[in-house]
Amino acid sequence: MRNRTLADLERVVALGGGHGLGRVMSSLSSLGSRLTGIVTTTDNGGSTGRIRRSEGGIAWGDTRNCLNQLITEPSVASAMFEYRFTGNGELAGHNLGNLMLKALDHLSIRPIEAINLVRSLLKVDALLIPMSEQPVDLMAIDHEGHPIYGEVNIDQLAQMPQEMLLSPPVHATREAVEAINQADVILIGPGSFLTSLMPLLLLDELTQALRRSSASMIYIGNLGRELSPAAAALSLQDKLTIMESKIGRKIIDAVIVSPTIDISGVKDRIIVQQPLEAKDIPHRHDRELLRQALENTLQQLNGADSV
């Protein structure tokens, strides 16, 4: 890849979950259908968790969040999709978008078809692919050897777990593997390290695709301290080491982090360290600043390729 900008890229793939993936995708929404998000589907908290306990299926919350952030044309449909019930009734706290996705899942052959129907309804061009279309939860073995089930409990761990795994073992969505295979650039993060990023790296098909990929890979760091005590204790280099040990080789070419992040120990990678925080929401990436940082990173990768 030489002297190319974001606008020149044929395929950009972003991996993650929560608010982080939506923020990245909305900053790159001008890429349209050339942008693909691979979304974590292990959430078991909030409205999503209640739906899963009642109806089963994959976690829809992170996908809904991404779709919300990709809406560029406000409409009755988008207002409905973003609506959250209030009050004290059984629907209180539920997001209508989650319920719509679950209903469409019942009507569709595959969850990805439900997502595509909503994308069409909301006029979202970017592609969204669940990491797996099979119901799955995150599980960890804590430092004392005890099994810990579910994202909510894992986020409360005081120390890093000995092991993380998916329960039950599931397959990656085939379109997710194909997207990685075709990508020019792959973005990882931002997001909760243990519960938004690591689940993706527990899928063998995805890690194999990442290991084979010749795409430039960029890790985007969080802006604020992680709520998870275990993840908050990790340095930037710790996170890179853990991710690459799961993937099986050193693949991350560049990192984008804020000026407050300690980059000590990070070697042999391009480091782009510049202001990224939005003024209106603490610890959230400003879309334009993030896009500028990505452009800056691409230019440095271009320079490294030409050496």
Swiss-Prot record:
Described function: Required for morphogenesis under gluconeogenic growth conditions.
Main location: cytoplasm
Signal peptide (residue range): none
Lineage of source species: Bacteria, Pseudomonadati, Pseudomonadota, Gammaproteobacteria, Enterobacterales
Species whose genome carries this gene: Yersinia pestis
Gene Ontology molecular function, alphabetical: LPPG:FO 2-phospho-L-lactate transferase activity
GO biological process: regulation of cell shape
Family: Belongs to the gluconeogenesis factor family.
Identification of the protein by name: Putative gluconeogenesis factor
Compartments where located: Cytoplasm
Keyword Cytoplasm tagged: yes
Record SUPFAM superfamilies: CofD-like (SSF142338)
Spans traversing the lipid bilayer: none
Matching InterPro entries: CofD, CofD-like_dom_sf, Gluconeogen_factor
Assigned keywords, A-Z: Cytoplasm
Domain of life: Bacteria
Any one cellular-component term (Gene Ontology): cytoplasm
Protein's UniProt keywords contain Cytoplasm: yes
HAMAP family reported in the protein's UniProt record: Gluconeogen_factor
